[in-house]
Amino acid sequence: MSSKEQNVHEEQVSKEKEGMESVMNESQEQVKSEDAQAEFDAQAELVQALARVDELEKQLQQSQKTEREAMIRAQAEIENIRRRTQQDVEKAHKFALEKFSNELLPVLDNLERALSAADHENEQMQPMIEGLELTLKSFLDAVRKFGIEVVEEKNVAFNPEVHQAMTLIDSPEHEANHVVDVMQKGYTLNGRLLRPAMVVVSK
């Protein structure tokens, strides 16, 4: 091979070598670019995944908070219903007892009137009078067990909560505005007025 041909051959080999190096460099750059893109994509997916996890955690917290609030409201409503039911039962019981007690008052009045009208001087009437007295005493003992009390005190200060003034009189023996006499007894039920005592009051 001549010197000229050898030079041409060497130049051709050199060009081919440079071409191969260029291709290899381009391949390496392409691989690096693809790796960088893959890493970027992976980071983006990770950020999205973390954001989704954060969103789900917030939703879970909100759901738990809503459930707790609903449970608290339900418990409060149950307690309110229980309290209202208990109050209604107590009111119904008190109303029924009060109504029943009011029905008994005329019976007590009639027994007392019968005793007042009876001839206590007549010996033949004594057994009947004693029977009336025992009946009245038993009756009063029975109603006291349910909280009924008699308002019949004299010489006490007039109390508009339990007394009803029927008349005013001058009475040197009593202080002003005091009960002189009881015309009709009053009654209370567990501290609540059933019927005021009708009284005569001193001026």
UniProtKB/Swiss-Prot annotation:
Residues 1-38 are annotated as: Disordered. It comes from Proteus mirabilis (strain HI4320). GO terms for biological process: protein folding. Disulfide bonds: none annotated. This is Protein GrpE. Its main location: cytoplasm. Keywords: Chaperone, Cytoplasm, Stress response. GO terms for molecular function: adenyl-nucleotide exchange factor activity; protein homodimerization activity; protein-folding chaperone binding; unfolded protein binding.
